[in-house]
Amino acid sequence: MARDRSDAKEETVKSVDALRDFIIGLQDKDGFWKAGGQLPSQKRPISETNQVSTMICLLGLATLDQPNEKMIESRDKAVAWIKSTPPNGKDPAVSGEWYTMRLVVAKKFGEPKDVEALRDQILAAQQSDGGWGWLWADKSDAFGTGLALYALAESGVPSSHPAIERAWKFLIETQTDAGSWIVNGTKTPNKDKLHAMSSFWGSTWALLGLSKSLLDSVMKTATASTLPAVQSPIVSTGTPTAKP
């Protein structure tokens, strides 16, 4: 999803093709990708985690400029599985990551009614401080807020929307002096304590959300004092520039 599309060197093309084939090779015959690594241990149902993994793989494959027959078949199977499979049986999804990725998928693959409904759900879940939690039941954090900003902007919500401006304010006020964002763990015994991996992901998505939602004119006129540049998504224990 983040590859440099201007790089058409033969070596790069071969690497992208190899990665494409690797991802397709991991797809289940039913159309989904099973979550791996640390993802199955996250504080949400594994069915929801599998859906998020599937949506991210699908969106990554969808960026390829010249999809081949094998990729098209993989894509269509994934879309069909996502549409026909609820995240948690009869229960709604619990993570903002599911709602945001589902919105991006709906926008990408032409589901106007779903786009509107998902966008409304995300906007309604915004907390009073302007942010979203990675888990919607938890406090706001950079991870959930960056995801929401990215998805809302991708779905067509303008940067002038009050919800976007409030989210910017939340991220500006919670960024550390080092340029990163602190995201706490969600499970005992790490709950309410800095979690290194979550902070890495949170800082990355905060940067992606800001980049996606900010207009070029705003980016050019923003000063370091009003919109501190993210120096690195590497976790820092620095203090926030201001309290929300």
Model-derived features: positions:
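An alpha-helical repeat/solenoid feature that recognizes helix-turn-helix modules
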Residues: 1-21, 29-75, 84-120, 128-169, ...
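Glycine/proline-rich, flexible active-site/cofactor-binding loop segments
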Residues: 78
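Compositionally biased, proline/threonine/alanine/serine-rich low-complexity intrinsically disordered stretches
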Residues: 219-244
